[in-house]
Amino acid sequence: MSDKSDLKAELERKKQRLAQIREEKKRKEEERKKKEADMQQKKEPVQDDSDLDRKRRETEALLQSIGISPEPPLVPTPMSPSSKSVSTPSDAGSQDSGDLGPLTRTLQWDTDPSVLQLQSDSELGRRLHKLGVSKVTQVDFLPREVVSYSKETQTPLATHQSEEDEEDEEMVEPKIGHDSELENQEKKQETKEAPPRELTEEEKQQILHSEEFLIFFDRTIRVIERALAEDSDIFFDYSGRELEEKDGDVQAGANLSFNRQFYDEHWSKHRVVTCMDWSLQYPELMVASYSNNEDAPHEPDGVALVWNMKFKKTTPEYVFHCQSSVMSVCFARFHPNLVVGGTYSGQIVLWDNRSHRRTPVQRTPLSAAAHTHPVYCVNVVGTQNAHNLITVSTDGKMCSWSLDMLSTPQESMELVYNKSKPVAVTGMAFPTGDVNNFVVGSEEGTVYTACRHGSKAGIGEVFEGHQGPVTGINCHMAVGPIDFSHLFVTSSFDWTVKLWTTKHNKPLYSFEDNADYVYDVMWSPVHPALFACVDGMGRLDLWNLNSDTEVPTASVAIEGASALNRVRWAQGGKEVAVGDSEGRIWIYDVGELAVPHNDEWTRFARTLVEIRANRADSEEEGAVELAA
């Protein structure tokens, strides 16, 4: 109450001070107006006199210009502006004495001051003059232009304020605003409503666990994270001057540059990145699957995290998990909300980001009709109106599923070589635009072609060349004027990457620049001669076959030298993502190296011709050595 009374007292004192200032200002304004009125009255006769003198001088000058010299006694200075007749000094003397002679004359002014008339008094008579004929010369004179710069004739009289008044106003204005603010605060305090009722702990828990609150919180927390984590560089120079000034940088995009890292302290720690995939519908989204965390037995074994490249937040967009390690994962093509995972137990799980649950919305049964071994390959193939989920497990079983029903597979097939040996599949790839034929890599190091339908359904050709298990396989993806869809690359534990064609069962070329297991390989989606591979020493290599086939075109080693398990190109081909054995995902910008020129396809065709010629020469030399 004391604070409120002090506030009111302070307000009253300010109001009194404000009233005093206003009265003082009003009094000064009245005095100023009174002074101006007095000065105006004093200036008026002087102004009239000065105008009359000016007109008189103009008249004299006009008379002199035409040869008339006014007599000195006829140019007396008028005493007042209202006077119509002015007496000469001699006349004044005669008038004082009372003698009114016949020669008395007066200078009389017309209503128009510019016209001068000499008249004699009618009562006193007129002196007789001798008249004669004279020549009259008529001359016209333009009136003199009079320009007045007086404030009185152009703008209203300016009001001059004293410095004291200005200081008073400067002092009053903020006080007025402060007083009004205090009044508003006082009114708000008086009209303040009663505080809302405090909720009980039971009511709070009921709200926190309600489905509506969970959905709202799950949706809005992502928006807030995006806003808080955004740190765009407002000083970025698009002209490239900063890149030119840096020492050691040849050109922007000549080398791999680190963009960002995805890592969650809770869900990524002590887990291995097993698979990654980019979304076709939302290119900024990437999903990654993780193995189990042996240090956290109570946590779910399988985890899939959806990361967002568009926003600079450090947490995943979505967190999904299941009870078995997720060995493979992909976005369901034509279904942007669905994520498919293949688990170590053999189950196929399906997550939906429209559901606020983190567990799968669908899963396949653990039965002989489906998979019972680890599933390392999941892929959605087909078109918008006719597509299927294709999965392959390490026991050689391939299943085709409908995403609407995962209870039973639509069709299944045993991938068996020579009708007796099941193929332990570790990788699968479909050529671009093909949904029937595919290639698979196996644990024995052999590569096979296979077919889903037709008379030759099952395992077809055999490609031998690797000396260890095949860890990665990928078909050529870049679409251009020349079709290279028959090409594919494989990586293996034998420290090599091999280039193959489905038209020949021997490798076209073997890239042997690595000194550790090569865990994955992938073609660029836009450049015909570019592919990326990763190895167990934490090294990412980019090979541009149009530039060199002996050493990588660009290479980078990640911090800590953790083994890199997976590599995936973004859809635009400008970024490449790699996952390591510590649960971290590294994003690198490829830059201009990934942009193909118009002649890249023809150059790559010539490169393939040279590779085939060199392989033929080496085979001939080998045959000669064997014969010798």
Swiss-Prot record:
GO terms for molecular function: dynein light chain binding; microtubule binding; microtubule motor activity; spectrin binding. Keywords: Acetylation, Centromere, Chromosome, Cytoplasm, Cytoskeleton, Dynein, Kinetochore, Microtubule, Motor protein, Phosphoprotein, Repeat, Transport, WD repeat. WD repeats lie at residues 268-317, 321-361, 370-411, 420-460, 465-510, 513-553, 559-598. The modification N-acetylserine is found at residue 2. Changing residue 153 to A: Impairs interaction with DYNLL2. Residues 1-114, 152-204 are annotated as: Disordered. It comes from the Eukaryota. The keyword Phosphoprotein applies. GO terms for cellular component: cytoplasmic dynein complex; kinetochore; microtubule; perinuclear region of cytoplasm; spindle pole; vesicle. The modification Phosphoserine is found at residues 50, 83, 90, 94, 97, 162, 180, 618. It is found in: Cytoplasm; Chromosome, Centromere, Kinetochore; Cytoplasm, Cytoskeleton, Spindle pole. Changing residue 153 to G: Abolishes interaction with DYNLL2. This is Cytoplasmic dynein 1 intermediate chain 1. It comes from Mus musculus. The lineage of its organism: Eukaryota, Metazoa, Chordata, Craniata, Vertebrata.
